[in-house]
């Protein structure tokens, strides 16, 4: 089985033992006490739904008094993500079953990875996470990062063992994580993580079916990509049969900002032929999102695309007002149209804008521009 996707899981001296003893990765969640607790749940769900059976997982152990930060590997994901509070680890309700893919006894130091002159340009998601310093329990890693980490771990472990994937070892879970698009009512008032299950919550507003938070669009796209929903993604030009990598919330260069979503397509799983950069937006398209979509797509072209114009910038939003010269429109819409016209003088890949409608089946992405 070809593996193109992996994630780094941040662990401490306690949680790393949970993984070793139980072959389960645990993600901590805060108690649902603040006004935006649903946003936090959707944020974690988005990351969890990016994980797929067969993908790799690395453990990034945080620094403590007597040791530096270290990276362990390599585990393989063997279940869909799920939510469970019926144990002594109720603070860690988001979970996924794993097994060893490579048995490496010795870890590698974080310093060896992030300061290696031969691979530093390839480690963009790890460097981005380190610089951002945000408390994220798990972060995606690129195909090049997976290869580099395994090579470095092999160098540290002469007598390592590789365990081939066998789908007979896949574990079925009773209630895998997913958003139910039919649930649009009020959410319950809860105090504890054990008071609810994420699958039973409402992530869309009742009358409009718009997402309650922008982050929920990341969750939905990961959910539909994990299903390889051909009808859904074909609407924006993505061929799910060619997709080799996808992820939400990716670091942009070494700045402390993030790209919402990236999808990579390839011919015969090897030669990248298209990259899709997707910015999500609640409400109506604005100038900042337009600028970011073009800025991020340029950066991807210069890095993953080897300087070519391979990246298609896309915005998915609630509303887009088409500019018509023969009708009076709001000044902001005129300004947005002017900005788009200026960008298109220089950009070979024109920005595409889609609105979404999750009240219908199949889910609708309507091209507006």
Annotate each language-model stretch with its function.
Residues 58-59, 73, 269-270:
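Aromatic- and glycine-enriched beta-alpha-beta binding-site module
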Residues 68-72, 76-143:
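Aromatic- and Lys/Arg-enriched surface recognition patch
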Residues 66-70, 83-87, 271-272, 305-309:
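Short, solvent-exposed secondary-structure capping/transition elements
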Residues 61-64, 82-88, 135, 249-251, ...:
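Catalytic micro-motifs at enzyme active sites that drive phosphoryl/nucleotidyl and oxygen chemistry
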Residues 37-50:
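TIR-domain catalytic/interaction hotspot
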Residues 60, 80, 299-303:
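Active-site catalytic microenvironments for nucleophilic, acid-base chemistry
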Residues 47-63:
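Short coil-to-beta transition motif at edge beta-strands of beta-rich domains
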Residues 1-34, 49-52, 99-104, 127-369:
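Charged, terminal alpha-helix-loop-beta segments
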């Amino acid at each position: 089985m070809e593996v193109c996707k992996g994630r780094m899981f941040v662990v401490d001296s306690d949680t790393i033992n949970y993984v070793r003893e139980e072959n389960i990765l645990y993600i901590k969640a805060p108690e649902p006490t603040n006004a935006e607790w649903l946003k936090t749940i959707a944020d974690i769900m988005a990351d969890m739904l990016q994980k797929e059976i067969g993908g790799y997982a690395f453990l990034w152990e945080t620094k403590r008094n007597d040791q530096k930060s270290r990276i362990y590997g390599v585990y393989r994901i063997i279940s869909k993500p799920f939510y469970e509070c019926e144990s002594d680890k109720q603070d860690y309700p988001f979970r996924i079953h794993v097994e060893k893919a490579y048995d490496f006894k010795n870890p590698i130091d974080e310093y060896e990875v992030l300061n290696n002159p031969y691979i530093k340009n390839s480690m963009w998601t790890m460097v981005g996470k380190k610089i951002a310093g945000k408390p994220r329990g798990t972060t995606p890693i690129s195909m090049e990062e997976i290869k580099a980490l395994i090579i470095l771990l092999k160098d540290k472990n002469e007598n390592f063992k590789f365990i081939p994937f066998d789908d007979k070892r896949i574990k079925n879970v009773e209630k895998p994580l997913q958003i139910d698009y039919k649930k649009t009512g009020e959410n319950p008032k809860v105090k504890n993580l054990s008071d609810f299950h994420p699958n039973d919550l409402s992530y869309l507003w009742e009358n409009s079916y718009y997402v309650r938070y922008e982050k929920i669009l990341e969750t939905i796209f990961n959910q539909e990509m994990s299903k390889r929903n051909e009808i859904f993604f074909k609407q924006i030009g993505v061929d799910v049969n060619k997709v080799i990598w996808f992820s939400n919330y990716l670091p942009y260069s070494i700045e402390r900002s993030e790209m919402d979503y990236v999808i990579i397509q390839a011919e015969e799983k090897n030669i990248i032929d298209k990259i899709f950069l997707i910015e999500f937006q609640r409400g109506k398209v604005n100038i900042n999102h337009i600028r970011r979509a073009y800025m991020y797509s340029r950066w991807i072209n210069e890095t993953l695309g080897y300087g070519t114009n391979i990246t298609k910038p896309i915005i998915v939003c609630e509303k887009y007002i088409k500019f018509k010269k023969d009708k009076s429109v709001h000044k902001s819409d005129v300004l947005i149209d002017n900005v788009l016209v200026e960008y298109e003088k220089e950009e070979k890949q024109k920005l595409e804008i889609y609105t979404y409608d999750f009240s219908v089946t199949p889910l609708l992405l309507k091209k507006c521009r």
